[in-house]
Amino acid sequence: MPSVSLSTSKPTTARADVLILGIRGDEDKGELAETLDLLGFSGEKGQTTRFPSGGLAKAPVVIAVALPAEPTAEDLRRAAARAVRSVKNAATVAVALHPAGVDEVEAIAEGITLGSYRYDAYKSAPQGDAQRIELASAVILTPFARQTTATKAVERAATVAEAVNTARDWVNTPPGDLRPADFAESITAHVSSSLGGNEVKVSVWDDKRLAKERCGGILGVGRGSDSPPRLVTLTYEPADAVSHLALVGKGITFDSGGLSIKSGPGMSTMKIDMAGAAAVVAATVAIAQLGLPVRVTAYACIAENMPSGDATRPGDVLHMRNGSTVEVLNTDAEGRLVLADGLALAVEAEADHIVDVATLTGACVVALGERTSGILSSDEDFAGTVLASSRAAGESMWPLPIAEEMKASVHSSNVADLRQHNPKPYGGALFAAAFLREFVGEVPWAHLDIAGPSFNDGAAYDYTPNGGTGVGVRTLVRLASELAGVR
Ligand code: BES
Ligand code: ZN
Ligand code: ZN
């Protein structure tokens, strides 16, 4: 990850290998007008072009990036990332994107760190000519450089973007190398290496403890795997906490579908199914690093969903943590079962608000596309707060209703209190949320269905790499600062 700093230098005098220069329209082109025109740089938002500075600037290479006349923070986050991704073989960049304020400086810093992410843990080291110089440092050029609010914004950006990158790493790890015990251990190691003292406490329940604690949902899903399930709980309890936020994440390290097995292509990306747990853990660590005055209890509900001679069958009934019974009718709808126990624990912990994050349904992807997460909630005000946080963070989310008729359907099991799977194939994301709502009592709760945005199976764009995206982390950190009333 490059280190990011601030400077009041002018773009032409900044010392760096590459100058990234934002162009907001013809006036911004100045002496470069002819060069940019010859390169076919039309100024269409997001466009980039690269050329030697020819002595016009100290930096030997310029990357021009087109900006709108009045770029938003998200425009700048994307532009910074896009430009940084096109840097090849340079160690230092100076970034001149004309931030209008400190929020924009923060967005640029986030874009730099998010855009430089690469997952190469399993790539052999490049040989000879293929060896690349990594970007080591970036300096953002702004007149605000000497203001402490700007320095703080850059520090905050580093914390948040590194948390996003941590979540990406977990999602990208091959599922055979991140089975439930591995994931739990990796979370424990991450917490202790990221925080100095014991600001965040970690507790891990193994399968025996889960049985003692009557977590029948997590156990039922993990039953078919040789690698038994885990529940990892993180607690951050600052003395000045003004509110208690519980986060619950779906942590299916691999979703084969279980006995209701998926098709080959359907399961090929299912290592992503722990992206919700990755997001809540990474966000909790970031919230603690930032010292936000909000108590956070995060539950990573971790299991591997596999078929076997002893896997949970369609027709089986599970005894859940909150005392209710659930008839399983499709073992591929496993996320709601592990989340239900986490949600019940969050209610027991007397949280003021609960947010769960889950790659829950293909239906949500059908409804909102691959880049927008669904927000489903029991409380309109709280849903509004979450939506506002997602906007401020630059993550695309949109509310979906929990349609009235779903309640009766969730209660229509002939043998148990609840049924886990809707006999009708419509509104799958809504039914899943109606099921989860049964476990949150009266606590204001929002469910983020990130099935689409958690993974990018195409080429990298803006700050979104191929593979795990780390979606949810930025919204959760914003939400915590919103609830804490600080920035
Ligand atoms: N993990 C999947 C949901 C998913 C699908 C995530 C595509 C990311 C991309 C989930 O466990 C699942 O299999 N859901 C089923 C539910 C159905 C059986 C009611 C689905 O969406 O098909
Ligand atoms: Zn599934
Ligand atoms: Zn799943």
How would you label these PLM feature ranges?
Residues A167, F183-R487:
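A generic structural signal for tightly packed, nonpolar segments enriched in small/aliphatic residues
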Residues M1-G251:
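Short amphipathic alpha-helical segment within the helicase RecA-like ATPase core
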